[in-house]
Curated annotation (Swiss-Prot):
A motif ('KMSKS' region) lies at residues 331-335. This is Methionine--tRNA ligase. Homodimer. One of its GO terms (molecular function) is metal ion binding. NCBIfam families: metG, metG_C_term, PRK00133.1. ATP binds at K334. It holds the Pfam family Anticodon_3. It catalyses: tRNA(Met) + L-methionine + ATP = L-methionyl-tRNA(Met) + AMP + diphosphate. One of its GO terms (biological process) is methionyl-tRNA aminoacylation. Its cofactor is Zn(2+). Zn(2+) binds at C145, C148, C158, C161. Keywords: Aminoacyl-tRNA synthetase, ATP-binding, Cytoplasm, Ligase, Metal-binding, Nucleotide-binding, Protein biosynthesis, RNA-binding, tRNA-binding, Zinc. It comes from Pseudomonas savastanoi pv. phaseolicola (strain 1448A / Race 6). Its EC number is 6.1.1.10.
């Protein structure tokens, strides 16, 4: 028998500035299932995480609430910990990036990078709030759009007309924090020399550490050229001060991934069997895996391994990337009741129903996963209750009634138990590959065979026939053994069901190896319901509890003609003559490439094909399209004769057209099918 593997696993750190929602839970449930599977097979698998507890947003929220940042992050950590525990996410340690371990490790890594010549400095010009005495990120600057004159717009884009611009282009800029007029000020910033690791990253990202689709996307970024990464922020800032640089702080994304190391180091202090260097030292033979969403791939597949390499530490064995969660086919929405907090779900439904549903739809790719309420109810009721639990509920009563709860010795259908045994390696391979959907399909196929066998033998009919009691016991004993096998295969996904089944089966906690054996002449405990069907009304109640209170916009709306209120919120502009309209050259454009803009909170960089030429356009639609690659290959509409605008990120050569109030509700416009790039819109 081979030696148990030694594995360290992390999930992305939740930000300590808000509640956990079902989109977050997709990642933590996925990771937890994989970790439980490894432990189920006898491997030493350690799962650590932490709250991401630094940054201006936390500092400002704490100030607004009249508490210290430390009090805020402590409160949020307690909430997060309770949500994770109740969703059966079993961390070996859940820590905080605001910790002594993280301060020590962040300083150590920075110092090693600095001493190796991988840190550069240069002056950066930014808006500065003279009242709060702090530099302002783009999202903390508001003013009048230089294009359409809309007021109260952010520092890098207009949510009304979609224009993008540099913060210095904004008219009447104001600090969103204090309301004062900001001033431009220079400051020394510190940069990590990421381009120095270009060759290392090109090799590492193609070494099997990433899914192919992710490696291909990373290759695009590498081919376009890496830039030095700004790793500093100025005081006041809630975080760690940079060694030997008073008033300068590590940017949150520098110390956040180091939080993985810090959480593990904190655990090592309580676990003498764990050696920190055996997991993080250069040349470590243990395994290290990060589970993350596709929105933070650049930090984990570029910055993080380069930092580790530059600091003389090991790099990850693998980075497992997943897609986003949609609900009923759309992005989560508070108004539709589909932006569901973890606690709201738990107030209405058991956690294992969602764990199973996620598992049934999670492949090893980076595709988005849709939580469809109707499908959710049907799948849980059909698979878990109608197939798995149904086997035990059908068979247990006959064994208790006919044989005092003692299972028979004989195997009534060896060919069936052999099929279950033969399926185990494939199910294990699916778990290992994080293809949970395949593991669930193959397990449910076995459940179908078990139910078909029981239905064919019909012990309820046999029990009424004289002289058939031994056959009833044999059929039902086999049914209980098949149920036990299914529980073994499902235990990483459904730990509570497994625990309740173990009590009923009167056995020690089941391990993966137990699938190779059968129970015989074995005493069962009395059976009680292991799961109940989902009532669709509970799902409706959960959605209702998630809806924001909507305020009526017009007291007389009930008697007015039907309308959606959009014109009231955004009145029509003044009339223009035809010549003014004709001067605008609208064209169909094909999105060749869409990508995040480093340092911009709201912008995407779009490369557009308009027939005979390509254009580079910056668009403030990031909040609605967090996965920009999904836009690639799509047709849209653009203003092609808009004067190019110089921005701090580059030149924007036009404007794409979108509708919506802003935030997540921005809808990029597309022409009807058949339109071609470059065609005029008229």
């Amino acid at each position: 028998m081979s030696e148990p593997r030694k594995i360290l696993v992390t999930s992305a750190l939740p930000y300590a500035n808000g509640s956990i929602h079902l989109g977050h839970m997709l990642e933590y449930i996925q990771t937890d299932m994989w970790v439980r599977f490894q432990k189920h097979r006898g491997n030493q698998c350690i799962y650590v995480c932490a709250d991401d507890a630094h940054g201006s947003a936390i500092m400002l929220r704490a100030e607004k609430e009249g508490i210290t940042p430390e009090q805020l992050i402590d409160n949020v950590k307690a909430e997060h910990s309770a949500d994770f525990a109740d969703f059966l996410v079993d961390f070996d340690n859940f820590h905080s990036t605001h910790s002594d371990e993280n301060r020590e490790l962040s300083s150590m890594i920075y110092t090693r990078l600095r001493d190796a010549g991988h840190i550069a400095t240069r002056s950066v010009t930014q808006y500065f709030d003279p009242e709060k005495k702090m530099f302002l990120a783009d999202r903390f600057i508001k003013g009048t759009c230089p294009k359409c004159a809309a007021e109260d717009q952010y520092g890098d884009n207009c949510e009304k007309c979609g224009a993008t611009y540099a913060p210095t282009d904004l008219k009447n800029p104001k600090s969103a924090i204090s309301g004062t007029t900001p001033v431009l000020k220079d400051s020394k910033h510190f940069f990590f020399d990421l381009p120095a690791f270009d060759a290392m990253l090109k090799s590492w990202t193609r070494s099997g550490t990433l899914q192919d689709a992710v490696a291909n996307k990373i290759a695009e970024w590498l081919d376009s050229g890496l830039q030095q990464w700004d790793i500093s922020r100025d005081a006041p800032y809630f975080g760690f001060e940079i060694p030997d640089e008073p008033g300068k702080y590590f940017y949150v994304w520098l110390d956040a991934p180091i939080g993985y190391m810090a959480s593990f180091k904190n655990l090592c202090a309580r676990r003498p069997d764990l050696d920190f260097d055996a997991y993080w030292g250069k040349g470590a033979t243990t395994e290290l895996y990060h589970f993350i969403g596709k929105d933070i791939v650049n930090f984990h597949a570029l910055f993080w391994p380069a930092m580790l390499e530059g600091a003389g530490l090991r790099t990850p064995t693998g980075i497992n990337v997943h897609g986003y969660l949609t609900v009923n086919g759309q992005k989560m929405s508070k108004s539709r009741g589909t932006f569901i907090k973890a606690r709201t779900y738990l107030d209405h439904l058991p956690p294992e129903y969602l764990r199973y549903y996620y598992a049934s739809k999670l492949g090893r790719g980076v595709d988005d996963l849709d939580l469809n309420f109707e499908d959710f109810v049907q799948k849980v009721n059909s698979d878990l209750i109608g197939k798995v639990v149904n086997i035990a509920s059908r068979c247990a009563g006959f064994i208790h009634k006919g044989n005092a709860g003692v299972m028979g010795e004989a195997n009534a259908a060896p060919e069936l138990t052999d099929a279950f045994l033969a399926a185990a390696p494939s199910i294990a391979d699916a778990y290992e590959a994080r293809d949970f959907a395949r593991a669930m399909r193959e397990t449910m196929a076995l459940a179908d065979r078990a139910n078909a066998y029981i239905a064919e033998k019909a012990p309820w009919a046999l029990a009424k026939q004289e002289g058939k009691q031994d056959e009833v016991q044999a059929v039902c004993s086999l049914g209980i053994n098949l149920f036990r096998q299914l529980v073994i295969f499902l235990k990483p996904v459904l730990p509570n069901l497994a625990a309740d089944a173990e009590k009923f089966l009167n056995v020690e906690p089941l391990t993966w190896e137990d699938h190779k054996t059968l129970l015989g002449n074995h005493q069962l405990n009395p059976f009680s319901a292991l799961m109940t069907r989902i009532d669709p009304l509970k799902v409706e109640a959960m959605a209702a509890a998630s809806k924001e209170d909507l305020t009526a916009t017009d007291a007389t709306a009930s008697s007015a003609p039907a309308g959606n209120g959009e014109l009231a919120k955004d009145p029509l502009s003044a009339e223009i003559d035809f010549d003014a309209f004709a001067a605008v050259d609208l064209r169909v454009a094909l999105i060749l490439k869409a990508e995040h803009v480093e340092g911009a909170d709201k912008l995407l960089r779009l490369t557009l094909d308009i027939g005979d030429e390509q254009r580079n356009v910056f668009s403030g639609i990031k909040s609605a399209y967090p996965n920009p690659s999904e836009l690639e290959g799509r047709l849209t509409m653009m203003i092609a004769n808009l004067k190019p605008r110089k921005m701090r990120f580059g030149i924007s050569e036009g404007m794409v057209m979108a509708a919506g109030p802003g935030g997540e509700e921005i809808y990029l416009l597309s022409p009807d099918s058949g339109a071609k790039p470059g065609q005029r819109i008229k």
